[in-house]
From Swiss-Prot:
SUPFAM superfamilies: (Trans)glycosidases (SSF51445), E set domains (SSF81296), Glycosyl hydrolase domain (SSF51011)
Catalysis performed (reactions): Transfers a segment of a (1->4)-alpha-D-glucan chain to a primary hydroxy group in a similar glucan chain
Pfam families: Alpha-amylase, Alpha-amylase_C, CBM_48, GlgB_N
Pathway: Glycan biosynthesis; glycogen biosynthesis
Name of this chain's protein: 1,4-alpha-glucan branching enzyme GlgB
Species annotation: Escherichia coli O1:K1 / APEC
Family designation: Belongs to the glycosyl hydrolase 13 family. GlgB subfamily.
GO molecular-function terms, A-Z: 1,4-alpha-glucan branching enzyme activity; cation binding; hydrolase activity, hydrolyzing O-glycosyl compounds
Assembly mode: Monomer.
Matches recorded under InterPro entries: A-amylase/branching_C, Branching_enzy, GlgB, GlgB_N, GlgB_N_E_set_prok, Glyco_hydro_13_cat_dom, Glyco_hydro_13_N, Glyco_hydro_b
This protein's encoding gene: glgB
Gene3D superfamilies in the cross-refs: Glycosidases, Golgi alpha-mannosidase II, Immunoglobulins
GO CC terms in record: cytosol
Length: 728
């Protein structure tokens, strides 16, 4: 037994209970000279090798049969590069000693990470292939300040936590280690003795790729190259741009018919992207693609926030999909979930044995609706983890926008909680001040760092200023989903037309608050699940009336101020609710031309017409862009308004929400002349009754509705028509 190392230290190191392996392992100056120590379980012989010559400088003595070796290098006083020749099971291997390398994280990075102000923490934390002192390998870093010991385990060390214990940087709570020879494509995890003395295996919070469920290991892979957002993509996100979003769940848009298996990212690039382009959509919105263990969460309970799910392929396959969308002229929106995370033991929950990422009090840290945990936004490192993630998807994948899920659950402490189940903020209020500051900070940083990318909020309350700048007291989002408009209009449309006259305000109320936010009008995945029925099936009447109602509603929606969002399947009037375990009902479009084809053609024409006419999108958030012409004809359920562009060009939109055609319907207009019908949801092209106005109508100098000139139209039954004024 050597007198240079205490037996208790060796025992603790081998047992995995020693927190400072670099103080023991590697090369050290002692009174006897330079001593090299190594923990190499199952090794039988170890020599210190001079790399340049390959000469054996010293044989290390086995001080413990469990694999602890030590030896003094004669006639050497200064540290030098060395390798170890190790014999395992009769086979000699030449390795570089991980414990001869100095600290990995620079002092400035460590300080910024501790302060929570490192814009790109993913460039430092996680697993990064690197070359140090001429040696190729991978540097690993993980934040676990309360763990007693952390080791890297993986395919490079037989998943043995004794072999690669990490160095703790006490000033930041980060553990680090460079492992020579570990390379891209290998699986790894962190094995730790947590704050309570329990042995845990954890996935890397900053892993750039991960295994597909049910496996949970992280994957070493390089940081993706940055993607520059083009000027065209920036313009496509602006307030005056036409934005028509096709919301998609990649796992159920279409599946292989022979085995019901998912399409890959590359197959989706070849099928989904050209379809969305052909349909005239401007944006693809993807339900969360972060790695997640439970298919039924649709991705909204992510465990790998930095890793695209392997369900559909590799990280590079996903980048291929994004590139294909951009090449087709489609911007890509990613659903982003910074509001909560699942309780799975391999992920963030009680990461180092303490409530590291979540609040410790369940009244703050547990979401009973979803059985998930809530991030502690007041903890700087946690907020930094999330802000960095937002920047990561935009900078490294070319994502054009983030749609933030469940904002209301973040900004209200009493969200879905009864009295006594929540804790007021420091001022006694119900607002989650830390979450509000986190959202403002995220939006501010994205605006500064990736100008042109935007964020959208799914916020279900009337919290003021969601899409207003921070200096105005807002949250700083660019857009907000108008869930009130969605609920009101769907409630109206499901009524039998005979009762709609008593609920006329459900269609007009939206304009009373339209300019308080920058709204997106969403018919999202949430509206076609959990017994709500499909959008088509909510419409009243027989089959003909259901389809007519739906077409009229779409015509109304595409004309109403606000950007558009339609969940997949609704574009061809799928009749059943969405099922995430199966393909959309594409068979409805097989065979002869039918009502489903008609709705699909209508949505395509709506998109292309909406994009072509600036009046339909240029002034969504400016009162000049909208004017009621007929707002009070509730007895006949008729509504008529004007959309207007910056130059004053107008489009008239007229809707008749009863099955009774309205002949010779006169109303006042602003601009006399010939008005051409550019869209009629009752057209035979869409399988309607083909009532209309022969393609065009001339105005009369007959006063109506307080205006000198007027039009006399036929308003088709259960239909919306658009008219544009012909140039003189």
């Amino acid at each position: 037994m050597s007198d240079r190392i205490d037996r208790d230290v060796i025992n603790a190191l081998i047992a995995g209970h020693f927190a400072d392996p670099f103080s023991v392992l590697g090369m050290h100056k002692t009174t006897a000279g330079l001593e090299v120590r190594a923990l190499l379980p199952d090794a039988t012989d170890v020599w210190v090798i001079e790399p340049k010559t390959g000469r054996k400088l010293a044989k290390l003595e086995c001080l413990d049969s469990r694999g602890f070796f030590s030896g003094v290098i004669p006639r050497r006083k200064n540290f030098f590069r060395y390798q170890l020749a190790v014999v395992w099971h009769g086979q000699q291997n030449l390795i570089d000693d991980p414990y001869r390398f100095g600290p990995l994280i620079q002092e400035m990075d460590a300080w910024l990470l501790s302060e929570g102000t490192h814009l790109r923490p993913y460039e430092t934390l996680g697993a990064h292939a690197d070359t140090m002192d001429g040696v190729t390998g991978t540097r690993f870093s993980v934040w676990a300040p309360n763990a007693r010991r952390v080791s890297v385990v993986g395919q490079f060390n037989y998943w043995d936590g004794r072999r690669h214990p990490m160095r703790l940087r006490k000033e930041s709570g980060i553990w680090e280690l460079f492992i020579p020879g570990a390379h891209n494509g290998q699986l790894y995890k962190y094995e730790m003795i947590d704050a309570n003395g329990n042995l845990r295996l954890k996935s890397d919070p900053y892993a750039f790729e991960a295994q597909m469920r049910p496996e949970t290991a992280s994957l070493i892979c390089g940081l993706p190259e940055k993607v520059v957002q083009t000027e065209e993509r920036k313009k496509a996100n602006q307030f005056d741009a036409p934005i028509s979003i096709y919301e998609v769940h990649l796992g159920s848009w279409r599946r292989h018919t022979d085995n019901n298996f998912w399409l890959s990212y590359r197959e989706l690039a070849d099928q989904l992207v050209p379809y969305a382009k052909w349909m005239g959509f401007t944006h693809l919105e993807l339900l969360p693609i972060n790695e997640h263990p439970f298919d039924g969460s649709w991705g909204y309970q992510p465990t790998g926030l930095y890793a695209p799910t392997r369900r559909f392929g590799t990280r590079d396959d996903f980048r291929y999909f994004i590139d294909a969308a951009h090449a087709a002229g489609l911007n890509v929106i990613l659903d982003w979930v910074p509001g909560h995370f699942p309780t799975d033991d391999f992920a963030l929950a009680e990461f180092d044995g303490t409530n590291l990422y979540e609040h410790s009090d369940p009244r703050e840290g547990y979401h009973q609706d979803w059985n998930t945990l809530i991030y502690n936004y007041g903890r700087r490192e946690v907020s930094n983890f999330l802000v960095g993630n937002a920047l990561y998807w935009i900078e490294r994948f070319g994502i054009d926008a983030l749609r933030v899920d469940a904002v209301a659950s973040m900004i209200y402490r009493d969200y879905s909680r009864k009295e006594g189940e929540w804790i007021p903020n420091e001022f006694g209020g119900r607002e989650n001040l830390e979450a509000i500051e986190f959202l403002r900070n995220t939006n501010r940083i994205l605006g500064e760092q990736v100008s042109g990318a935007v964020t959208m909020a799914e916020e279900s309350t009337d919290f003021p200023g969601v899409s207003r700048p921070q200096d105005m007291g807002g949250l700083g989002f660019w857009y907000k989903w108008n869930l009130g408009w969605m609920h009101d209009t769907l409630d109206y449309m499901k009524l039998d037309p005979i009762y709609r006259q008593y609920h006329h305000d459900k269609l007009t109320f939206g304009m009373l608050y339209n300019y308080t936010e920058n709204f997106v009008l969403p018919l999202s995945h949430d509206e076609v699940v959990h017994g709500k029925k499909s959008i088509l099936d909510r419409m009243p009447g027989d089959a003909w009336q259901k389809f007519a109602n739906l077409r009229a509603y779409y015509g109304w929606m595409w004309a109403f101020p606000g950007k558009k969002l339609l969940f997949m399947g609704n574009e061809f009037a799928q009749g059943r609710e969405w099922n995430h375990d199966a393909s959309l009902d594409w068979h409805l479009l097989e065979g002869g031309d039918n009502w489903h084809h008609g709705v699909q053609r209508l949505v395509r024409d709506l998109n292309h017409t909406y994009r072509h006419h600036k009046a339909m999108h240029e002034l969504d958030f400016d009162p000049y862009g909208f004017e009621w012409l007929v707002v009070d004809d509730k007895e006949r359920s008729v509504l008529i308004f004007v959309r207007r562009d910056k130059e004053g060009n107008e489009i008239i939109v007229a809707s008749n929400f009863t099955p009774v055609p309205r002949h010779d319907y006169r109303f006042g207009i602003n601009q006399p002349g010939k008005w051409r019908e550019i869209l009629n949801t009752d057209s035979m092209h869409y399988h309607g009754s083909n009532a209309g106005n022969g393609g065009a109508v001339h105005s009369d100098e007959i006063a109506s509705h307080g205006r000198q000139h007027s039009l006399s139209l036929t308003l088709p039954p259960l239909a919306t028509i658009w008219l544009v004024r012909e140039a003189e």
